[in-house]
Amino acid sequence: MLVGSQSFSPGGPNGIIRSQSFAGFSGLQERRSRCNSFIENSSAVKKPQAKLKKMHNLGHKNSSPPKEPQPKRVEEVYRALKNGLDEYLEVHQTELDKLTTQLKDMRRNSRLGVLYDLDKQIKTIERYMRRLEFHISKVDELYEAYCIQRRLQDGASKMKQAFATSPASKAARESLAEINRSYKEYTENMCAIEAELEKQLGEFSIKMKGLAGFARLCPGDQYEIFMKYGRQRWKLKGRIEVNGKQSWDGEEMVFLPLIVGFISIKVTELKGLATHLLVGSVTCETKELFAARPQVVAVDINDLGTIKLNLEITWYPFDVEDMTPSSGAGNKVAALQRRMSMYSQGTPETPTFKDHSFFSNLPDDIFENGKAAEEKMPLSLSFSDLPNGDCTLAPGPADSLPGACAANPEITITSTELPPGSQSSQNEGLKDSSSASCSSSSREGSEPRPHPEGETQGLGKPEGCPVATGARPERLFLQKGVAEALLQEALLQEPSELKPVELDTFEGNITKQLVKRLTSAEVPAATERLLSEGSISAESEGCRSFLDGSLEDAFNGLFLALEPHKEQYKEFQDLNQEVMHLDDILKCKPAVSRSRSSSLSLTVESALESFDFLNTSDFDEEEDGDEVCNVGGGADSVFSDTETEKNSYRSVHPEARGHLSEALTEDTGVGTSVAGSPLPLTTGNESLDLTIIRHLQYCTQLVQQIVLSSKTPFVASNLLEKLSRQIQVMEKLSAVSDENIGNISSVIEAIPEFHKKLSLLSFWTKCCTPIGVYHSSADRVIKQLEASFARTVNRDYPGLADPVFHTLVSQILDRAEPLLPASLSSEVITVFQYYSYFTSHGVSDLESYLNQLAKQVSVVQTLQSLRDEKLLQAVSDLAPGSFPAPQEEVLRTLALLLTGEDSGASEAVTLYLTAASRSEHFREKALLYYCEALTKTDFRLQKAACLALKSLKATESIKMLVTLCQSDTEEIRNVASETLLSLGEDGRLAYEQLDKFPRDCVKVGGRLASEVATAF
């Protein structure tokens, strides 16, 4: 969530918005003293600081190269570093232009000494700019070399996979051994370049500005802050003084930036000698810290943002002590002393967000240390638990820095001094054309090719992965079985002919020559024969493309959500243990079983095309003007396989059409798989992979809801019960992955209890495919429901079959809203979700349960269609005992009617809920549903739940409503506040306590300062 505005901050000369600490029940004079302490700016009690700490001994400069390269992370850090260096250049160029203009104006009326000093300053800036330009060129050179090694490694990886699908022969084994040696060499080169690039990142200077707390900071409180960045550590202790000021035993630390690694911050309140209370623990992304201006950062330490750690972070592109040769030892010491004195002007107190006295002029040492003389860039961080470790940025100011959110929280920076166009380059991403999914091969403006009869018979079109059309529609996209059979047939004919191929340097593209020599006339015939026999369905691949990330991403997202709250509940500890066990099982799987079991479709062309970028023949470029080789054309060029080259290749070699597949692996980077295997983490069974990902994501969602509802025990208890069932699912998934290596042909082996519910088992068997027994798409389940039960449901409830089936699927997936038709094909239902849902509802016969559900849907549609008097009559007839339990769909519809513009309908529903709440059974179920709805992300449902709780007079929900009163959405805050005030004396007291500190402070000064608050 992005919150930003620009206006003057009254918080003091340093500009950080002060949080007026909650005064509790102390006297008026003490409360007034605390509030005033946030605005005054007198000097604080200060503990002596010996010298600036620096992590040279633990930094990356003395560390060994990483064991595995991280190309995606390197790309992200390179982009951020390049933008930061460019910003430094821009800042200094602006200052140079200003001084040059000033020099021209002063030549006539100034003394020689003044001109000499000004000219000397200009030359200093010019020298520093030349150094920056040289540094940029060095970084570009390293990154370009890294990209070349990455493509070589990627090509070797594809060759390994292509040989793995071919029959074993002596020549093949020798070639595979050579490829393995090359792959290892390329990997080592990438790691070495990463280590060298890491040395060019400069350093981060982090200055402690103090804690800001809402209702938390009281005189005498002692806190310990522990920061970890790779192998670098910084621990400091502080105390809140009586006058609201703060004293800390540490003031500044220098961290050396890392390519792989995030800043971890843990804040602990020291209660006594052996009593420590963990306030919060967060992880911070560092990419956006590469900026020319000092940045003031407010980090949300706890979930509600009531404790914030304020830091001032400055990035230096060069080591502070790594001076230019022209500067002697005296200058180096003087520069360091000046920098020390600048940061030691006062001990941190409760901070403010603007420092008007920062730099009025450019100091001399700024060009030695790399510090830009510009106004600080204020920003704020707010960390919250998100599914899969992802974050969502709401639309912010036009000049805010855009960025894609990944596995960790990111920093969003707003600078009002840079024009919007200057940051447009941030949106440019590097596209690696070396790996692609089957759906990425489609091109616009092409017509599908009509297949001959003999070719279309038995040709199964995979669901979710259609046969793509292209600039040359004659190309066919084959499945793994086809590619493997082609390689086997080609290699078995001449098993001893696997030897180096002589290439003509004047003939042209390397891939063209290799494919021309390696393809034969018999292969297309074999292709037609195999295609006519049919292909295996690739529904799992189509569904996987819609899932958010890989197994690694799902594991990381859950671990990130669990980490700060692992000790809060026993269920969290059990879940963490089971998930770690499953992760260990997958990491220990043999690489051979993965490469042969996963759905890869590699052929000679797709592997050899990886090396096209090595073709630098000038003669070839002159011979064929349509072919472009972009090696050396910039940082992006080494990843660019132009469509022009591929199209011209298809036209030159018509005999190669029709049998060469372009379906590559989804991810050929080195991940967390075993022993340098190029394949990602997998069980070896695509359906099982999808199932594990879905349950990991669902567990992440449950953990977040439990944390949010932890203050309301009956809601948390219900969610913990759901989580317990997921822990049992994780145990079964671990057993299946460990014992059977993912090769299960019957769902009974995964869930032995299924044989007791034969009707449910029979229906599931119809929904899934033979190779995907663990999952099915929601679309497929609904179609099977229509085929099996539509006539029965429509007979008793005409026209309700479709909404009944959609409602059932939504409930199986535990969704608050019905699924949209467009999302059905991308939603995955696992066999464990299917079995768990019907077991928890005591269902053994699907047909009878659908009739019950149809009755519920009938009531819902009746309520939605009636108005005023008819609605009042309908809800009056709807007695609380009409159903065995108040159904979720009915409760949801009643709540949503409260949000409508029809006052008569709202009044009718309010009267019904008030009357129905007298039934203890109804009230218990309704209270649980509406309180759980408050934890959902749907704002409309949250608002409706608040109004329903207001009608139920649910004082049990006060704590959750207090949390909702601090929402970023004003409408939700208002509705939650109104609901609180309607809940009698307890609600009024809770609202008054909430209102004792300014709401703007809860929003981290969103209305008072020029800042950005980002929720991760």
UniProtKB/Swiss-Prot annotation:
Sorted UniProt keywords: Cell adhesion, Cell membrane, Cell projection, Chemotaxis, Coiled coil, Cytoplasm, Cytoskeleton, Differentiation, Hearing, Membrane, Myogenesis, Phosphoprotein, Signal transduction inhibitor
GO CC terms in record: apical plasma membrane; cytoplasm; cytoskeleton; filopodium; stereocilium; stereocilium membrane
A Pfam family this chain is assigned to: PL48
Free-text description of this protein's post-translational modifications in UniProt: Phosphorylated. Chemokine-induced phosphorylation in neutrophils occurs in a PKC- and AKT-dependent manner, resulting in RIPOR2 interaction with YWHAB and stabilization. Phosphorylated by PKCA, AKT1 and MAPKAPK1A; in vitro.
Main location: cytoplasm
Gene Ontology terms, MF aspect: 14-3-3 protein binding
GO BP field: cell adhesion; cell differentiation; cellular response to chemokine; chemotaxis; muscle organ development; negative regulation of cell adhesion; negative regulation of establishment of T cell polarity; negative regulation of protein localization to cell leading edge
Assigned protein family: Belongs to the RIPOR family.
Protein name per the record: Rho family-interacting cell polarization regulator 2
